[in-house]
């Protein structure tokens, strides 16, 4: 079974490094992913979080597009409730004009930060996703020219005027996103790294209820947290740092990503071990043999067309190596030479 692999990058800030380091590491990874044969490179949007550092993926994507040649680029995703659908459409049409047939627009409804930050980003008018379905419908209508006549943007010139369109994706971790994507006839990326329990049911419902739009067919990607290492010992050290991150998040601590050294030096009590055990099913960590086996099982369980790999490791070189090992294991360069 051929497996299509892509990259989701949250631009992590590792302890002891700066935001500038994190952005440079994203550019390094994008170039590597392009060379290795990954299908697409997505950047996530977050606000006010010390561990991740990309509040404006559309800006960073312009740079990534200029540094790469083949790989698709996109948002994973734009947090649409903050913005005008029309403006987001313009931004991604501009990216599509710069990089034809290479752009994905993935949208989500989460705030990408805490509620105080959300209100600051939205100038005090954050709507908590109440109008999100309407906004996604507007994007569909803007891109295919089917906005109703009574819509504010009907007949308004949408620029740049180009023949191609970004590929529109719905991002989600529940049946809400899956069913909305099915209703609108667009692609769906399920965040297994957020919700590992019911994803296969969401995937099944998405396919069953899909309504084709202009000949569209259901297409499902599962976004999975993965760390791949050369040895079990290295994998265990990297997982220790991930465990510390899990505890930090459970306690609501706004901190950089733990380094490998921090993970090695951290002692966990009974409560922390309980948190770690509860969260382990949301990640796949190990050697190439173990990781590929588990990814194949997950792909079959979801009947996924594609796997999108999120790797947040305790060092930037370890992150690069993880993607290298995966690409080798799945022979990506034979798929995308």
Can you say where each PLM-predicted feature lies in the sequence?
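Hydrophobic faces of well-ordered beta-strands that scaffold small-molecule active sites
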Residues: 5-9, 41-43, 73-75, 103-107, ...
């Amino acid at each position: 079974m051929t497996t299509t692999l892509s990259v989701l990058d949250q631009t992590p800030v590792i302890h002891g490094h700066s935001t500038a380091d994190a952005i440079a590491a994203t550019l390094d990874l994008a170039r590597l992913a392009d060379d290795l044969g990954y299908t697409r490179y997505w950047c996530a949007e977050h606000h006010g979080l010390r561990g991740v550092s990309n509040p404006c993926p559309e800006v960073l994507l312009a740079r990534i597009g200029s540094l790469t040649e083949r790989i698709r680029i996109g948002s994973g995703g734009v947090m649409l409730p903050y913005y005008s659908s029309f403006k987001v459409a313009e931004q991604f049409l501009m990216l599509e004009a710069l990089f034809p047939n290479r752009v994905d627009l993935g949208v989500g409804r989460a705030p990408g930060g805490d509620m105080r930050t959300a209100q600051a980003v939205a100038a005090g008018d954050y709507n908590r996703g109440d109008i999100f379905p309407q906004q996604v419908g507007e994007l569909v209508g803007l891109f295919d020219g089917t906005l109703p006549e009574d819509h504010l943007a009907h007949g308004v010139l949408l620029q740049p005027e180009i023949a191609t369109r970004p590929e529109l994706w719905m991002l989600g971790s529940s049946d809400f996103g899956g069913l909305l994507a099915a209703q609108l006839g667009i692609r769906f990326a399920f965040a297994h790294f957020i919700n590992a329990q019911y994803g296969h049911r969401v995937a099944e419902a998405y396919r069953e209820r899909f309504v084709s739009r202009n000949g569209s067919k259901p297409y499902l990607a599962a976004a999975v947290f993965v760390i791949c290492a050369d040895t079990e010992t290295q994998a265990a050290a990297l997982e220790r740092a991930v465990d510390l991150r899990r505890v930090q998040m459970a306690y609501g601590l706004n901190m950089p990503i733990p380094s490998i050294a921090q993970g090695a030096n951290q002692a966990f009590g009974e409560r922390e071990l309980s948190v770690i055990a509860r969260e382990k099913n949301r990640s796949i960590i190990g050697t190439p043999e173990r990781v590929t086996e588990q990814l194949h099982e997950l792909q079959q369980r979801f009947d996924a067309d594609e796997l999108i790999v999120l790797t947040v490791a305790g060092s930037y070189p370890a992150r690069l190596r993880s993607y290298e090992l995966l690409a080798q294991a799945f022979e990506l360069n034979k798929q995308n030479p």
